[in-house]
Amino acid sequence: MGASATNSVTHPAFTLNVRPDNIGIITIDVVGDKVNTLKAEFADQIATILQQAHALPKLQGLVIVSGKPDSFIAGADITMIAACRTAHDARVLAQKGQSILAQIAAFPVPVVAAIHGACLGGGLELALACHSRICSLDDKTVLGLPEVQLGLLPGSGGTQRLPRLVGVSKALDMILTGKQIRPRQALKMGLVDDVVPRDILLDVAIQRAKAGWLNRRALPWQERLLSGPLGKALLFRIVRKKTLAKTRGHYPAAERIIDVVRKGLDQGGPSGYEAEARAFGELAMSPQSAALRSLFFATTSLKKETGSAATARAIHRVGVLGGGLMGGGIANVTATRAGLPVRIKDINPQGINQALKYTWDALGKRVRSKRMRPTEQQRQMMLISGSTDYRGFERVDIVVEAVFEDLSLKQQMVADIERFGAAHTIFASNTSSLPISQIAALAQRPEQVIGLHYFSPVDKMPLVEVIPHEKTSEETIATTVALARKQGKTAIVVADRAGFYVNRILAPYINEAARCLLDGEPIESVDNALVDFGFPVGPMMLLDEVGIDVATKIMPILVEQLGPRFAAPPSFDVILKDGRKGRKNGRGFYLYSNPTLHSNSTKNSSPTKNGNSPAKRNSFKWRKNKVKPVDSSIYTLLGVTPKAHLGAGVITQRCTMLMLNEAVRCLDESIIRNPRDGDIGAVFGIGFPPFLGGPFRYLDSLGADKVVQALRLLVQQYGERFEPCQRLVTMAEQQQQFYPVDANIDEVTDVAS
């Protein structure tokens, strides 16, 4: 790796080693943390390191590397914002970051960033301030500016340096979406100067520093054209229009990003940096950013929990009962994310083949985009095998059942696993409606039976519900949560009652939307009202995507166990008798010229297949909703004459108030353990607007008294189903909130119910 160092300076997170060839190596290694993040106190340390390097008369260059195995810099420490009480405080924080990175940019000898692992947010802004960037050709290496997903913008110069480096259109795309860029793509767009194998990364970076100042690569002609007055004006007009169409005005960070980038290009760097810091300060104090950051911290804290006081049993092999889309999706995330061998059992070879094809196609997309080598695709596929019998299940630690929603069938599956599996094998049912206690009723080892409810498509939806019944052991809970985490899922533990949590709060929302339709409101008016409110798709479109038959199957169970407030309007029976199942058979609320026979129509389909994933650790993800024509024959079928008359506000209030009320009931009945889990479940499971933070944070923002008042007015207008639950009434009377009023969002990880 080269000559040994002759001089070194160490600070808590930064070490400067000067080699005999006069190249300084600055190593970033935040003590006690698994990944590097930039903290406020590091500003002085960086300044001191740079001053000491500047004082070395023979210094030829600097290389910045990470001391962590697979992390360059994962971003700035978001908890810094919690210390900011005003927009001015946050603005000063941004200005301090700008000042430090300006010192790197102005350093008199070349500074090279040697990037391996995550280089995100403030980490990429630091790399952009360097004079050259070399990154490793490794799956763990990604570059991006994800601040928009937290309701912020890059505050340390990212909005100004990136457009000048890669061009304004590519920069806007990166910053507005928060997307992560892979090494080859980063090289192609000019974000990095070279991509090399990890084992020679430092050597190549040192040679680049020795080479002295290099000419900056010219922008492609398309980007140069867009930098001109006419091209720039056209580009920003198009970008602003598309942004507003996607965000519906709910995410002010996106609009501020456009403004700040434009200002820097029009008025020069100083004006751009000043606008960036000011916008960062104002956005940091916005309710949208507070809500999005609360979701980030909530998911982060949840990932550290086991769901139980027990220690999880080691998982070496996983079984899946049932092929098809759901079984294939579960096998896919188990093999490709958890890295565990999977054995699929189906009654016929076609089901197994379909499950195998699911993963082969998913990995094939990565191969075609050069994000994976064909040999790696083959290696991961070898983790999945299948059979029409139970051979191999004697070595399986946990079995995930994904067969039809038939109680006797699932009970038979439990008996089979107890017969053919190991004595310790856990049986996890992917049921969406059947009580886990009934599935375990005939089990010899009921303590090893649990619910594990995935949402479809499994490889895209981040949430799972873990459902223990009264006899489930603590070890079984901990082991099931551990599997979900290995699969890259965010798991919430919920009680074994009808609908669990997600489907239970979704059902009244769907029912009320259907009642609005029966009141004569056009389908598109209902859907547009809820999309404008912030949901990714409207309830009618949702029913078509999930499958009208699938989505309404749980309603009778909810009525039987929870009461008449869950009774579905008669429209569903009429629609189903007409053979309308939604997109999967080309007949639903909307017209489909080319129905997809294998759309998200499995029993556990999610309300939004593009759900909000923080994950990519974040809670805001843009969606492209294709406008489909309404099937107007459905109005004749239902005997209604469509006419917009309710207004978007009334539609939204009727649907969302029922969802909020039911969420509070779930908390009161201990279906969920705390408001945090309820917020995560709603946002990641049904697409509740992330910028509102989830049902419970939204309730706090409205005030319990205002919500109770609104519900009582709705009772007078529409009936007893809007009666506010007692927990909500009590909170209104005592002026209580679900989250502590004076707590910073990063300090609130849960609130006891």
UniProtKB/Swiss-Prot annotation:
Write out the ranges of the annotated region (Disordered).
593-622
- Compositional bias, Low complexity, is annotated for 599-614
State where the protein is found.
Cytoplasm
Keyword annotations for this protein, in alphabetical order, are: Cytoplasm, Fatty acid metabolism, Isomerase, Lipid degradation, Lipid metabolism, Lyase, Multifunctional enzyme, NAD, Oxidoreductase
Ranges for the region named 3-hydroxyacyl-CoA dehydrogenase are: 313-747
Q: Name one GO biological process term.
A: fatty acid beta-oxidation
- Please give the chief subcellular localization of this protein: cytoplasm
| Molecular-function GO term, any one | NAD+ binding
Q: Which reaction does it catalyse?
A: a (3S)-3-hydroxyacyl-CoA = a (2E)-enoyl-CoA + H2O; a 4-saturated-(3S)-3-hydroxyacyl-CoA = a (3E)-enoyl-CoA + H2O; a (3S)-3-hydroxyacyl-CoA + NAD(+) = a 3-oxoacyl-CoA + NADH + H(+); (3S)-3-hydroxybutanoyl-CoA = (3R)-3-hydroxybutanoyl-CoA
Map out region (Enoyl-CoA hydratase) in residue numbers: 8-197
Identify the residue position(s) of the site Important for catalytic activity. E125, E147
Keyword RNA-binding on this protein?
no
InterPro entries xref list: 3-OHacyl-CoA_DH_CS, 3-OHacyl-CoA_DH_NAD-bd, 3HC_DH_C, 6-PGluconate_DH-like_C_sf, ClpP/crotonase-like_dom_sf, Enoyl-CoA_hydra/iso, FA_oxidation_alpha_subunit, FadJ
Query: Which EC number applies?
Result: 4.2.1.17, 5.1.2.3, 1.1.1.35
| Pathway assignment | Lipid metabolism; fatty acid beta-oxidation
**Keyword Cell inner membrane annotated:** no
Which PANTHER family does UniProt cross-reference here? TRIFUNCTIONAL ENZYME SUBUNIT ALPHA, TRIFUNCTIONAL ENZYME SUBUNIT ALPHA, MITOCHONDRIAL
Function, please?
Catalyzes the formation of a hydroxyacyl-CoA by addition of water on enoyl-CoA. Also exhibits 3-hydroxyacyl-CoA epimerase and 3-hydroxyacyl-CoA dehydrogenase activities.
Subunit structure, briefly? Heterotetramer of two alpha chains (FadJ) and two beta chains (FadI).
Q: What NCBIfam families does UniProt report for this protein, alphabetically?
A: FadJ (TIGR02440), PRK11154.1 (NF008363)
**Family label:** In the N-terminal section; belongs to the enoyl-CoA hydratase/isomerase family. In the central section; belongs to the 3-hydroxyacyl-CoA dehydrogenase family.
User: Can you name this protein?
Assistant: Fatty acid oxidation complex subunit alpha
Give the organism the record lists. Answer: Yersinia pseudotuberculosis serotype I (strain IP32953)
